Amino acid sequence: MLASVSAWAQETGSIALDYRAAEHRLLERSDALAASDANVQSKEAQAGATRSLGRPEVDFEAQLLDYQKTLYLPLGSLAPVAEAFGIRDPLRFRRRETAVRPIVTATLPLYTGGLIAGTKAGARAQLDQARAEQRGAADKARLQLVQAYYGQQLAEQALGVRRDVLAGLDRHLADALKLEREQFISKAQRLQAQVARDDAAREFERAVADLATANAVLAGLLRAPEGVRPITPLFVLPQRLESLENYKAAALSAHPELERLRALEAQAQAGVTIERSKQRPTVAGFGQYNFDRRDSLLTDPDWTVGISLRYKIASGMGRNQAVEAARQTVRQADAGLREAGVQIEIGVAKAWNDAEAARSRFLLLDSAIESARENLRLQRLSYREQQATSLDVIDAELGMGRVRVQRAQAAYDYVLALAQLLELSGQIEQMADYAARADRVMP
């Protein structure tokens, strides 16, 4: 139980990674990011497919026909003569044949009422949405990495503190047993030491379990079954962060969620264009050529060119209501975009304030640790001289551990708040740079 944290990590065979290397591994191996990449590629292909809209469409059609055709030919003034020869009026001809009809048809849209433009705009907006979602997924994965990576660091710090507290209370219990045998203290004081030591042992066991859980989380996130040993320590920047307004401005211009909502708004606008096109006529040029004229029907032309105009007079669906529905979708997207901007500004302000508060707590706890360490030393000396009770030593030992844990927690709170601030302002890819320039780290 008293083995050091570094020895424990080495025994597990875990791989040592600094934060930048861990981030690189995450971006390479995350299945969620692979899925978002595939979505972007899908939308890129879809947008590419719409670029050819408006070009001529050429169809080849081959028909195998088994047909029968009956023709009637009126004889007119020749009817009396024909009747003398037993010929009925009108003459009837019946033809039954099997024929092959190879036909090529070309169609060129000349005017679609905005359908093609709306379809292209919608495809581009879907691509923009996919790219925003891809970036958002990457940013959320980075934030999750910060929580897991530095969460394991916090668990290691807590384990080290619980180990030291347990060792200190072991020493105190040994002293109490000696003093009890020499009848310098009562059994009640020795029992106080025993109870405190047992509590510390349970806290240590819980810290071991917490560290194992944190390691499992980070190992799973980085697809490293052998485990990961973080080597970039918890840190706190001694100087204040940039102004809150700078982070807000960055968030409103670069946050992936706002980009996603802008893309949705563009899709809604494209939907309005498409619905309006259904109220307008369409004009197209066309041409058709028959490659086998010998077997063609009497009504089939050899070739045809022309212009067609098509306008739907009545529809089973209310076209005006469809346009209005599309407009309301635009309003919905616009309102959602404004609301998201407000919520992101609130989130940025909270994260900025949390980071500054954690930084202040961390710096103030420096002097608290020195005071707690000196108090513990004096209480131990006073106890040996019978100037302090067992409870005084226990309180001093626990107080020292509490302050150390609070300092590690303050560093973790700072790192997490900073990561949330950077994620909200679209800058979380700079997290490794912030860690590199920190000069206040947890050992």
Positions of the model-derived regions?
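Sec/Tat signal peptide C-region and signal peptidase I cleavage site
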Residues: 5-9
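Periplasmic alpha-helical coiled-coil/stalk elements that build and connect Gram-negative outer-membrane
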Residues: 11, 17, 136-252, 351-354, ...
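Acidic, low-complexity, intrinsically disordered peripheral segments
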Residues: 11-12, 66-68, 406-443
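Small/polar-residue-enriched beta-strand and adjacent coil segments characteristic
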Residues: 15-18, 57-136, 259-340, 351
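N-terminal targeting signals for Sec/Tat export/insertion, comprising classic cleavable signal peptides
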Residues: 16-53
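Amphipathic alpha-helical coiled-coil scaffold segments and their short linker/junction regions
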Residues: 20-27, 78-89, 185, 224-288, ...
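Amphipathic alpha-helical coiled-coil segments
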Residues: 35-50, 137, 141-163, 171, ...
